[in-house]
A protein has these predicted regions:
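Conserved catalytic Walker-motif region of ABC-type ATPase nucleotide-binding domains
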Residues: 99, 221, 309, 337-339
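An intracellular "coupling" helix at the cytosolic face of ABC transporter transmembrane type-1 domains
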Residues: 13, 104-105, 121-130, 134, ...
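Juxtamembrane loop-to-helix connectors within ABC transporter transmembrane domains
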Residues: 2, 11, 80-84, 88, ...
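Membrane-integrated ABC transporters
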Residues: 1-32, 47-59, 76-80, 84-87, ...
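ABC-type nucleotide-binding domain
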Residues: 321-322, 328-585
Length: 585
């Protein structure tokens, strides 16, 4: 119930609407309780005495009661339904914003489909228990308590027969509710698996097709759906048995009530109108009893989903700004790694006692075999992760003491795999700087050698690039990414040079753009191009998480160490035509 209380706290900003809606709900429920009393008078006075004036008066009174109930219920429904949609929308936004506070490690450890399932399926599951469940609880409680008070006053013996129903319903709800909660959580978890497979197949569509794995993926998805169906079928079986069982108990009680009440009418202890009114009140009371049982099962299903959602909200980012973090001043570009260590898993360090320094404005190239730790080192500098030991300083300031956003605003990154949003070219470049003018965007595109091909596109800068930029070539996507970095104008540039095969023209254009981008700023590059290594003031050679060599290209070649070996064994491979080397990372 702790999670449900947390859900109800989401209603606090809208308490005025909730209070007004509750008042109208109480009024609607109260008018409903008055109707059987008028029905009793209709039978005992009008039907027996055949009084036409009383008939008209009672008919008008009942009509007015129904009209009042209609108006009050309509206002209540509007206020509560609008509030529910607003609260759920706010909750989705809250979840989305929380995801953006999470560190990279959170997404590395979890599959995309699981996160998406929580944001969609789980939120939908809790939607009806946020306002609808409390409203139903209030409405049915008024009907139940009000009805019991009235029938006790009318006939306590008949009341006792009606109330026998309560323990049986409570027992049913408790037994079946627990099972439904477990199954609901199980279903959500299994749906997350199928959502993950679906997301992977959409994003990796070309890979699936090229390897002709349609049947394999279809089988994976079918098995995941079938698995969730099995759990859903169990829930359906329980629900299918639960509903009719409640109806059977209620019908049996009504049958006994009719039998005993009929005897009371025959013996003259109660009037026919009182029996009819009593049966109507018994129906009103039985409704809440059955409703409470159904509400309990709905609550258990919602709690299963809310558990997964609050698990997400309660997860704290492994990398976050300290409470007293300082705002990063304008960065000059000095970088220091001081005995820095890092591990993804305990007892398995991937960065081992790395120490080096970079002067402002220097270009440093990182080279080494695959798995050497180059990408991890870059992530530590970007502060996607924090070192497990040692320290990283920028301009002499420890990164752990810096407010994250103030640091990230001054860091630019061009990743090896260019990520574009499925929007226009203009939006993708402008993403680097809020309020960038058209002139600034065009200037950045020109500096990245992208303006010419953009102007050849059907809608030029307004051209939609498709999901992840699929409508553009690899070289065009890279130039858009470079333009974005140029527009940001970062103090420190982090560049993971792409290894994808490009035509000679694209290669030359990209190289020119990168050289412009790296001018007059500190640049840390995972290098794959010979020109980048030759232009670097310092080359750091990494192997097994440590820096094993450093110096210029000529100095490292003279040492005849790992760098020399990589070069001569063609793991660093000179491309005579495209002025390119490749390092497998």
């Amino acid at each position: 119930m702790k999670n449900y209380k947390r859900l109800l706290l989401l209603l606090l900003p809208y308490k005025k609407k909730i209070i007004v809606g509750t008042v109208f709900l109480i009024a609607a429920s109260a008018t409903n309780l008055a109707v059987p009393l008028y029905i009793r008078n209709l039978v005992d006075i009008v039907m027996v005495e055949k009084n036409l004036d009383h008939l008209n008066n009672i008919a008008i009174a009942i009509s007015l009661l129904f009209l009042i109930q209609l108006i009050c219920q309509t206002i209540h429904n509007y206020l509560f339904d609008v509030t529910e949609k607003r609260v759920i929308s706010d909750f989705r936004i809250k979840l989305f914003n929380h995801l953006h506070k999470m560190s990279v490690s959170y997404f590395v450890k979890r599959r995309t489909g699981d996160v998406m399932s929580r944001m969609t399926n789980d939120v939908t599951t809790i939607e009806n228990i946020v306002t609808d469940l409390p409203a139903t609880m209030i409405q049915q409680s008024i009907r139940l308590l009000g009805g019991i008070i009235i029938i006790i006053y009318m006939n306590w013996k008949l009341t006792f027969m009606v109330l026998i129903l309560a323990p049986a319903l409570a027992l049913f709800a408790r037994v079946f509710g627990r099972k439904l909660k477990i199954l609901s959580t199980e279903i959500q978890d299994k749906l997350a698996v199928s959502t993950t497979i679906l997301e992977e197949n959409i994003s990796c569509y070309q890979v699936v097709k090229s390897f002709v794995r349609d049947q394999l993926e279809s089988r994976r998805f079918s098995e995941a759906i079938e698995d969730s169906f099995i759990s859903a079928r169990k829930r359906v079986i329980i629900s299918a048995f639960f509903g009719p069982s409640i109806g059977f108990i209620a019908f049996s009680t009504s049958l006994v009530l009719l039998w005993y009440g009929g005897r009371e009418v025959i013996t003259g202890h109660i009037s026919p109108g009182e029996l009819i009114a009593f049966i109507l009140y018994a129906t009103i009371i039985a409704g809440p009893m059955g409703s409470f049982a159904r509400m309990y099962t709905r609550l258990q299903e919602g709690l299963g989903a809310s558990k997964r959602l609050f698990e997400l909200l309660d997860t704290e980012s492994e990398v976050r700004s300290l409470p007293n973090a300082q705002i990063m001043p304008k960065i000059s570009g000095g970088i220091e790694f001081d005995n820095t260590c890092f591990h993804y898993q305990e007892n398995r360090e991937v960065i081992k006692h790395v120490s080096f320094s970079v002067k402002p404005g220097q270009t440093v190239a990182l080279v080494g075999p695959s798995g050497a730790g180059k990408t991890t080192l870059i992530r530590l500098l970007h502060r996607f992760y924090d070192p497990t030991r040692g320290e990283i300083r920028v301009d002499g300031i420890p990164l752990k003491n810096v407010e994250l956003s103030s640091y990230w605003k001054q860091i630019g990154i061009v990743p090896q795999e260019t990520i574009l949003f499925g929007d226009s070219i203009e939006m993708n470049i402008k993403y680097a700087k809020d309020g960038a003018t058209d002139e600034e965007i065009i200037a950045a595109a020109k500096a990245a050698n992208a303006h010419s091909f953009i102007m050849e596109c059907p809608e030029q800068y307004k051209t939609i690039v498709g999901e992840k930029g699929i409508r553009l070539s690899a070289g065009q996507r890279q130039r858009i990414a470079i333009a974005r970095a140029i527009l940001k104008n970062p103090s420190i540039l982090i560049l993971d040079e792409a290894t994808s095969a490009l035509d000679n023209e694209s290669e030359v254009l990209i190289q020119e753009a990168l050289e412009r981008l790296m001018q007059n700023r500190t640049s840390i590059v995972i290098a794959h191009r010979l020109s980048t290594i030759h232009n670097a003031e310092k080359i750091l050679v990494m192997d097994d998480g440590a820096i094993v060599e450093f110096g210029s290209h000529s100095e490292l070649m003279k040492q005849k160490g790992l760098y020399h070996r990589l070069y001569t064994l063609k793991n660093l491979e000179l491309g005579a035509k495209n002025n390119k080397i490749e390092i497998h990372t």
